[in-house]
Amino acid sequence: MNRYDNRLHILTKEYDELISRENEKILPGNGVFERYKYPILTADHPPLEWRYDFNPETNPYLMERFGINAVFNAGAIKFNGKYLVMARVEGHDRKSFFAIAESPNGIDNFRFWEYPVQLPDLYPEETNVYDMRLTKHEDGWIYGIFCSESKDPDAPAGDLTSAIAAAGIIRSR
């Protein structure tokens, strides 16, 4: 087995073990809620296809091409008997996107859907999105409220931290 294939085998094996790992209840608990040993989503949970170019000609060393800092602050909902979380996925550039992961029990075996959520670019000045919250409404739609961030035009020159936050809304069936 060559170096590329060996690395691909290791990456795939580790990823499959991670997403199929059974979570362990931490005992004794407090009688009100249960804690578990492993986080349900981490920066290692997004699909390898999102992070790696699997073409040996363009990525002969199988290096990660899209780095992920964290997966966190998810909105969650039970839908059609499964647990869905719409998580914030933050890249190494500190910009975020939303992606949906699904679990049969809400405790482990979360698997991301094939593609991240695609939000329409209605406001080109927006630079980041985060903090999605979901609810299923009696009208049959699932609504999501999230925070949308834009650079503060009144910030001093060179200030990369000042921002203006606004609320966004999405809906889907």
Regions found by a protein language model. Give the residues of each.
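Beta-rich carbohydrate-recognition and catalytic domains
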Residues: 1-73, 77-127, 135-173
